[in-house]
Amino acid sequence: MTRKTPIERYRNIGISAHIDAGKTTTTERILFYTGVNYKLGEVHEGTATMDWMEQEQERGITITSAATTAFWKGMAGNYPEHRINIIDTPGHVDFTIEVERSMRVLDGAVMVYDSVGGVQPQSETVWRQANKYKVPRIAFVNKMDRVGADFFRVQRQIGERMKGVAVPVQIPIGAEDHFQGVVDLVKMKAIVWDDISQGLHFEYRDIPDELLATARTWRDKMIEAAAEASEPLLEKYLAGEALSEDEIRQGIRQRTVANEIVPMLCGSAFKNKGVQALLDAIIDYLPSPVDVPAILGHTEDDKTAERHPGDNEPFSALAFKVMTDPFVGQLIFFRVYSGVVKTGDTVYIPGKTRKERLGRLLQMHANVRQEIKEVHAGDIAAAVGLKDVTTGDTLCDPDKVIMLERMVFPEPVISQAVEPKTQADQEKMGVALHRLAQEDPSFRVQTDEESGQTIISGMGELHLEILVDRMKREFGVDATVGKPQVAYRETIKQAVKDVEGKFIKQSGGRGQYGHAVLNVEPQPPGKGYEFVDAIKGGVVPREYIPAVDKGIQDALTAGVLASYPVVDVKATLVFGSSHDVDSNENAFRMAGAIAFREALRRARPILLEPMMAVEVEMPEDFMGHVMGDLSTRRGMIQGMEDIAGGGGKLVRAEVPLSEMFGYSTTLRSLTQGRATYTMEFKHYTEAPADVSEAIIRGKGMGRQ
């Protein structure tokens, strides 16, 4: 089956923004005007099509990137039909992972800004992610009808805060209650939308006299930006010749695709103004799959290879999202970079070194699905029937294997114990957690070997709260969540010699006799436990020596200060004695444990706490507040640097994990939400005396 739309007319775009900038409403309007959705969905009524999880509608925030397809022929019917694949992305910082994974598979992005709030924290994070994946973008300043709306302030903020070159291709006509429409600077015409038809009808008018001078000023700036795209355009511009509308669009497109400028538009999605012009700009200025560089990967013999976006190339695709659907089970969303794949085809998954057969292929409109028989280069689709695929996996032709660059996901920064309320919940919880971890690579599940508890880890308090909530709603699992916990360790500071351990019971019948003498000394950090047999003359029979080692390992599981595991010690068995009848393995195991615990008490035991490498990215103005706060958390500043591309400052510090709980909330309020941070385990270090004493008291332990 041949493709219906040539690949040059595809646009794979994401719609990204800070929470509450009106991103979901903008997407809804796009679906309405492209004819997919006939009744407008409103987020504040809880009916928006893209926000399809129950929780998203309740909270009014977008959690999951839903993918949908729309077709557009231009607001004046002046284009051949284009196919626009849209990925809606969340704007809450705990869901940054969703934005990151969609950026990886996009060719272009629409950044939605609130005309009053302007460039907000998540906008900066999303901008950095778009820079990382070199995604060309256009800006849509939304909510122009709000009190305090200021299009030009947002234009300045994009330059000041994100060092982006924002080039208005429209300016607003009026603002707040008087917002009527926009001036199209390319055509030099006013566009006014009609309220009665929900913005379906519009007309071109002459620019109001009071705006003419402003429009000319901004048009000159736009033409200058367009002219810098190529030598011929620049020569024409410098010679004082007028550039045609097509030449202006061509120049702006070239520079947008090259990530040199960001065209700016405005409107009010809620009031149905400006969205069709935004659709035209997506076609005019954002790239098709053939306008961006070929995707790179590695062959089986680890040579670099590339795949070009064409149907005649070998099939290659990237799975960018795994979801559990209540009707069809697991859905794998994937972006096809090259080739064609049909229902029933076998694909190879290089990361898992296995083949799988594609079941049904679906194209999604939010959570409404349409079954299709094949997908082509440039398409985004969902597959049913792939068993062992996780987010970030490559799917490819089994005969032409390529492994596309994997997505890198941040390590989780918060952990909590989770316990099922009933035995029935216990079995279901295992299945639920496995499913959720498959869907979300930033969510981890592990079992604490010491307590046997299930520990869940994620990107923030809201992240874990929503996942626990999903366990209840989607899998019927009731669970209680504990407070965040820190894994402390114990070790020793000095060496001790000739510490004796005896386990002797000899009162009638067969007795017990074990006797071991140990030297115990500290090891360098990270060296772990070491056992040395230094017995001479057979005073401890050979067959009992492994039992002494086993007894010491038993004692390692709980130290003498607060029952935390003991690390980095060396134990040498130097002497002992045995009894011909009463000695056995168990007696020597007990003797080894007794000697070792006594050695720990004498060897200046200390508590170790985990230190985290923390990196905070923020605008420079907040650096003093952030560094002051890190110091109060016993943090040690390791360094500072400018973020490449003028995106503020990066502070690196080492901070004890115990001081980092609740940090996301504090950081948000310290920086008006304009900072982001990452945290990963670095090493263990000695806890200060006051901290140790508090922990020991908290565990109800004195020195044993």
Swiss-Prot record:
GO terms for molecular function: GTP binding; GTPase activity; guanosine tetraphosphate binding; translation elongation factor activity. GO terms for biological process: ribosome disassembly. GTP binds at residues 17-24, 88-92, 142-145. One of its GO terms (cellular component) is cytoplasm. SMART domains: EFG_C, EFG_IV. Gene3D superfamilies: 3.30.230.10, 3.30.70.240, Elongation Factor G (Translational Gtpase), domain 3, P-loop containing nucleotide triphosphate hydrolases, Translation factors. This is Elongation factor G 2. It comes from Polaromonas sp. (strain JS666 / ATCC BAA-500). The lineage of its organism: Bacteria, Pseudomonadati, Pseudomonadota, Betaproteobacteria, Burkholderiales.
